[in-house]
Each structure stands twice: as C-alpha cells, then as structure tokens.
Swiss-Prot record:
Substrate binds at residue 172. It comes from Alternaria alternata (Alternaria rot fungus). InterPro entries: AKR_Detox_Biosynth, NADP_OxRdtase_dom, NADP_OxRdtase_dom_sf. This is Aldo-keto reductase AFTS1. PANTHER family: NADH-SPECIFIC METHYLGLYOXAL REDUCTASE-RELATED, OXIDOREDUCTASE. The active site is at residue 80.
Length: 366
C-alpha cells in the first residue's frame, strides 16, 4: 500500500478551502454547520412586493456569487415576496448546478402567503393581516401554527423550493391560539418524515420559547436548535432574557436586522439612495438621538481602523452569536461581510460602542 500520496491534502481540497471565505459554525448544540454570514432572503424575490427587493435575474446571480465564496446558508420565509424568494432559491440551485446537499436552506412558516388565485398582484401582502385572514375562507388553516396549517405551509414551501427537505424550518412567530403541544408534535412529525432536518424559531418572548421547548422535552419530541432574534448594536433588548436562555440551553442564536437596514453601514450624516434606506426600517426607532450617537461611534471606530462601518457592527455581533442574517444586495456587500471575520474589537472599543445604549421598547415579537 502506497501511503506516500496521502501525506499531503488533495489540491482540489486546498483550492476549495481557499474559495470558502466564510466561517463555519455549529448551530447551537446540534451537529448542523452553517456559514457566517447567512444570506438573508428578504431581498430575494420580486420588486413589486417591495421596491428594495432584487428581481429574479439579479437574485440568481447574487446567490451564485454567495455560494462561490462559501456563503452556503440561505435564510428565507414563505411570505417573502409571497413565495417568490423560495422559488428563486430553488431555481438558483438548478440553474447553477449547485448540489442540494451543499446548501443549508432555512425557511419559515406562520405568516399567510397571498393566494395568487384570488389576488394576482404579488405586491399585495396578506401576511400582516392575521385577524382578517382568519375570517377568510381562502386563508383559514393556511397560516399560524396549527397542525393543519404547518403541514399545508411546509408542503407549499417544499414545492416552491423544489426540494425534498428543508434543512431548518423556523416558526416565524409564536401562535398563542394553538396549544404548544399541537405545534411541537406537528413539527416533530415533519422531522420524523424527513421533510425537515432541524427546527428553529424566530422573535418571541423568552417565556413563549421556553413553553414550546418544554412541551417538546417532556414528550421526547424534537426541540428547537436555533433562535433568530432582532439583534444589533441599535437593538439589544434580547439580551435581557432570550439570549441568556439560549446560551444556557444550547440554542444557537442568529440575528436579523443585523445592520439595522443599513443604518449601521453608513455615517449618520450620509444620505442613502437605496429604496430601503430612503423608506425607512421595518420597525420604528423610538430613540433616534441614542441611535445616531451609536452610529456615530461605529463610524468613528471604523475610521480609526480604516475599515467599513459594517465590519465594526458585524465584528461586535460575531463575538456574541452563531451568525448574522444579512440582506446582501450586491457582490460588494458579500465581500465586505466576509472580511468582517478578520476584525476583532478590543474591550475598550466594545465598551465605547455599547455605553450609549439604553433600554427601549420591545419590537419584532408580533
């Protein structure tokens, strides 16, 4: 047996490592490895849904660029562009011949997806009107976290993604109308059916998340391995309880709103031309004076280091979570986010960035 040829790694493996610019981390106590950063799919879809969304051609090219650089974890939701985000991710895999097993797809269920059979305008979002949807013959059992609605939503997502399984199925929010046991048993059954590999959750109160985890644990069902929180230098309320709970119980934390819709990526006095920046963030800033001061400090730190502001904000996050979900809208933004892995803030810099923050109203749980 000739062992000499095995003394050095294959050239193909070395080249693959060089091309893989992302950092890879385990998602909580699970065995699943995800990339840091995670590509956010809210930007992927149809501009009719929102004017800052990339169209199909732009999205497919962006997904290819992300994959080639090692960003192999893509986060989306059934409601994003009313399902178009999921469709485009599935199409990108086919168009670029990307093996399904080489990409981690995270999607979400709970919100209503507008039915094209009764509303052909893809720009209309039913997701934000749950009370009205619950009174509609066309939407009952098509949103929320009942067994019936979860199964319906997952089957629809699988078809749009053109895949046999979802790597991480996340519940988009807590559903107080459904018994925790019903929700968790339905999710567990999907894992047993191999339609879902892992379970995750997104923004809710810590006690709600604990109730769901307890329901799964006491019945020996599949538990959540991740929590996707609203979290950034401008919004740190999840540090009160949720992040502590996740760290104590081995749940991997990932963040949405990581750069606060780009506010943490540009100086406070710089006007933005991007539609999302012009039209404002999803949630209201209840303390703009505080936010402007934090943004000023991020800018000052970035200038002193000679790096983009986004890398300062992401370096702060990367030390505290598994990975940030980022709406990467261009190849330049992908490269910028990937280079944040080389930035390590000092204790003094962290204190400087954090000290202007004061507690604020909870946002993003509904």
């Amino acid at each position: 047996m000739n062992y000499e040829k095995w003394r050095h790694p294959p050239v193909s493996l070395v080249e693959s490592v060089k091309a893989s610019r992302a950092v890879y981390k385990r998602l909580g106590n699970s065995g699943l490895v995800v990339s840091n950063p995670i590509l956010g799919g809210m930007h992927i879809g149809n501009p009719k849904w929102n004017d800052w969304v990339l169209d199909e051609k732009e999205s497919i090219a962006l997904l290819k660029a992300a994959y080639e650089r090692g960003v192999n974890t893509w986060d989306t939701a059934n409601m994003y562009s009313n399902g178009e985000s999921e469709k485009i991710m599935g199409k990108a895999l086919r168009v670029h011949n990307i093996p399904r097993s080489k990409v981690v797809i995270m999607t979400k269920c709970c919100r209503a997806v507008t039915d094209p059979n009764i509303e052909p305008d893809i720009g209309i979002s039913t997701a934000f009107y749950p009370e009205l949807s619950g009174q509609s013959k066309d939407y009952v059992n098509h949103f929320g976290l009942s067994r019936a609605s979860i199964f319906q939503q997952v089957e629809a997502s699988l078809q749009r993604l053109n895949t046999d399984y979802i790597d991480v199925l996340q519940i988009h929010r807590f559903d107080p109308e459904v018994p925790p046991e019903e929700t968790m048993k339905a999710l567990h059954d999907l894992v047993q059916m191999n339609k879902v590999r892992y379970l995750g959750a997104s923004s809710m109160w810590a006690h709600e998340f604990a109730i769901l985890q307890h329901a799964a644990e006491k019945n020996n069902w599949t538990k959540f391995v991740s929590m996707q929180n609203h979290y950034s230098l401008l919004y740190r309320e999840e540090e009160r309880e949720m992040i502590k709970y996740c760290n104590l119980t081995g749940v991997g934390v990932i963040s949405w709103g990581s750069l606060a819709s780009g506010r943490l990526a540009r100086p406070p006095d710089q006007r933005t031309v991007s539609p999302r920046g012009v039209n404002g963030t999803i949630y209201k800033d209840y303390n703009p004076t505080q936010s402007e001061e934090i943004i000023r400090r991020v800018h000052q730190t970035a200038v002193s280091r000679g790096i983009p502001m986004s890398q300062v904000a992401l370096a702060w996050l990367n030390k505290r979570i598994v990975a940030p979900v980022i709406g990467l809208s261009s190849v330049e933004r992908i490269d910028e986010a990937l280079d944040a892995k080389a930035v390590e803030l000092s204790h003094e810099e962290e204190r400087y960035l954090e000290s202007a923050y004061r507690a604020q109203s909870i946002q993003g749980h509904a």
